[in-house]
């Protein structure tokens, strides 16, 4: 039997140094090619953890990166497979993110923005000429070759890039990053190269004023803005921007992809090709100031998403929101109404803990550019977990009014207290709110274990989880009850409502039972002493 030889070319030819970045299945480290002393960045992928689909994506990324050779694109120099690992050896770019460099500059003008977007357009044009659509153009993927003044802008991360034939339009899946998605992707229409030009329009808008054209903390409303092309050029910051710059943005942010400007056409636009005479040279300090806040918000959001659901331990106090100076809050939805304002202090949440949340946001620090199908699904699943937490908070607080707002009037339920019967409507549950929950002032803490969310189309979802309820019994001893729950949610008029639930195990919210002289708890009356929703 012939012996198999394991490839060790990377191990033999390269020396690894410090870590530069990390993702779910990969790490990026500085490395040196031993024979030449040349330094590179090695993206090291743990292939033992990859699915067959992930292997295909890795092969596609390597194939695309090998094809693209341009001064404004981070170049792939080598692709090596070894036992359990795959190594992609890229240019070592040391200048950091373009947007971070801009805010450190003493002088920044419209002409500088023109030069930045020109380099981005050059990279996009090269991709499109080679039949590649990047699909994830955003600030995190725009790097500088070095820290030297005037260093080249380099487009990075082709993990979502696809290969297309000419001007082919097809449905390649929901991919990208929310604020940079094009209307056609959100409509789930066939798409192609124009999606990159839409993202360029968003980037150019930010380069000129320091905040994005489309903004809403609520992803659904953000998508509605994008699909409607609902952006403008508000005063006073846009008053000092030349008409030619606005014209180029309008051509990039054209809703109809067939009429949207191409990369090659954009490079010929007067604001790019005749920068010296067309673009303003005035220093834009307000843009720099706004961009600092924009960068801080991006970094904060990434950090929050990374740690958000490791464990969530909420205060037993009522939800509070401290409003920082200058932040406008919509009290109904706790939405920041302007992207130019300061970063809001997060609201405290009810006393519910989510543990081991496989369906929540677990962002890698590599980038937020997982497929938006994954991203969108994660966001929608998180919405379901959130509204489930709110429902349980209403139960814990004995707040029947809040409960009825979250539940459908025709709510159906199977639960132990109904003795196998299907309960319909709110009257069965009203009894417990009025006679038990409202009279209980004992602290209650609920833990949701292992929530799993199944999305059923756009407007329906099912969540299954284990619910642990901690409380103090009549003698002051700590107790815990467990139930297994499934809830079905339906979205009507943009609002999620619980339409059905099925619960097994113990009832979930304790009511202090009477005590008999020997100290033993009396559960006479059966389960009617326990809240059952």
UniProtKB/Swiss-Prot annotation:
Residues 283-292 are annotated as: Autoinhibitory domain. Its EC number is 2.7.11.17. GO terms for biological process: positive regulation of cardiac muscle hypertrophy; protein phosphorylation; regulation of cellular localization. It is a peripheral membrane protein. ATP binds at residues 20-28, 43. The modification Phosphothreonine is found at residues 287, 306-307, 365, 370-371. Residues 14-272 form the Protein kinase domain. Residues 291-301 are annotated as: Calmodulin-binding. Activated by Ca(2+)/calmodulin. Binding of calmodulin results in conformational change that relieves intrasteric autoinhibition and allows autophosphorylation of Thr-287 which turns the kinase in a constitutively active form and confers to the kinase a Ca(2+)-independent activity. It catalyses: L-seryl-[protein] + ATP = O-phospho-L-seryl-[protein] + ADP + H(+); L-threonyl-[protein] + ATP = O-phospho-L-threonyl-[protein] + ADP + H(+). The modification Phosphoserine is found at residues 315, 319, 364, 367, 438, 524, 528. The modification N6-acetyllysine is found at residue 318. GO terms for molecular function: ATP binding; calcium/calmodulin-dependent protein kinase activity; calmodulin binding; protein serine kinase activity. It is found in: Cell membrane, Sarcolemma; Sarcoplasmic reticulum membrane. Calcium/calmodulin-dependent protein kinase involved in the regulation of Ca(2+) homeostatis and excitation-contraction coupling (ECC) in heart by targeting ion channels, transporters and accessory proteins involved in Ca(2+) influx into the myocyte, Ca(2+) release from the sarcoplasmic reticulum (SR), SR Ca(2+) uptake and Na(+) and K(+) channel transport. Targets also transcription factors and signaling molecules to regulate heart function. In its activated form, is involved in the pathogenesis of dilated cardiomyopathy and heart failure. Belongs to the protein kinase superfamily. CAMK Ser/Thr protein kinase family. CaMK subfamily. This is Calcium/calmodulin-dependent protein kinase type II subunit delta. The gene is CAMK2D.
């Amino acid at each position: 039997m012939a012996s198999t030889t394991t490839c060790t070319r990377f191990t033999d030819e390269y020396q690894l140094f410090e870590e530069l970045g990390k993702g779910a299945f990969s790490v990026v480290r500085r490395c040196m090619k031993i024979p030449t002393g040349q330094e590179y960045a090695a993206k090291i992928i743990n292939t033992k953890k990859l699915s067959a689909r992930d292997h295909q994506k890795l092969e596609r990324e390597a194939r695309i990166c090998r094809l693209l050779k341009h001064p404004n694109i981070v170049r792939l120099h080598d692709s090596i497979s070894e036992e359990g690992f795959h190594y992609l050896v890229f240019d070592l770019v040391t200048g950091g993110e373009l947007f971070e460099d801009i805010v450190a500059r003493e002088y920044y003008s419209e002409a500088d923005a023109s030069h930045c977007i020109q380099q981005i357009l050059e990279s996009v044009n090269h991709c499109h000429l080679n039949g590649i659509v990047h699909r994830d153009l955003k600030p995190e993927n725009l790097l500088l070759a070095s820290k030297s003044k005037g260093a080249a802008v380099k487009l990075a991360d082709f993990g979502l890039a696809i290969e297309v034939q000419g001007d082919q339009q097809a449905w390649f899946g929901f991919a990208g990053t929310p604020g940079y998605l094009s209307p056609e992707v959100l409509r789930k229409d066939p798409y192609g190269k124009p999606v990159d030009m839409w993202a360029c329009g968003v980037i150019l808008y930010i380069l000129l004023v320091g905040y994005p054209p489309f903004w809403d903390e609520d992803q659904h409303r953000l998508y509605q803005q994008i699909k409607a092309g609902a952006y403008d050029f508000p005063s006073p910051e846009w008053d000092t921007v030349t008409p030619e710059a606005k014209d180029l943005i309008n051509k990039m942010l054209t809703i109809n992809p067939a009429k949207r400007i191409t990369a090659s056409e954009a490079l010929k636009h007067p604001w790019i090709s005749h920068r010296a005479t067309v673009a303003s040279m005035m220093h834009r300090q307000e843009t720099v100031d706004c961009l600092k806040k924009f960068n801080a918000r991006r970094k904060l959001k990434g950090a929050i998403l990374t740690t958000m659901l490791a464990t969530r331990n909420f205060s037993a106090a009522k939800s509070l929101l401290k409003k920082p100076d200058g932040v406008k809050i919509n009290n109904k939805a706790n939405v920041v109404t302007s992207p130019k304002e300061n970063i809001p202090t997060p609201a405290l949440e009810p006393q519910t803990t989510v543990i081991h949340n496989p369906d929540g946001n677990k962002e890698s620090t590599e980038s937020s550019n997982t497929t938006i199908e994954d991203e969108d699904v994660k966001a929608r699943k998180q919405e379901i977990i959130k509204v489930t937490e709110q429902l349980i908070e209403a139960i814990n607080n004995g707040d029947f009014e809040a409960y009825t707002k979250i539940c459908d009037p025709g709510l159906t339920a199977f639960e132990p207290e109904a003795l196998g019967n299907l309960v319909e409507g709110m009257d069965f549950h009203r009894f417990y709110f009025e006679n038990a929950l409202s009279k209980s002032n004992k602290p209650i803490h609920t833990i949701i274990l292992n929530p799993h969310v199944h999305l059923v189309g756009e407007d329906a979802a099912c969540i299954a989880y284990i619910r642990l309820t901690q409380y103090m019994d009549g003698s002051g001893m700590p107790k815990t009850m467990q139930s297994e729950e499934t809830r079905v949610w339906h979205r009507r008029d943009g609002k999620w409502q619980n339409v059905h639930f099925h619960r097994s195990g113990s009832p979930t919210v304790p009511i202090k039972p009477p005590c008999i002289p020997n100290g033993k708890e009396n559960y006479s009356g059966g389960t009617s002493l326990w809240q059952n929703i």
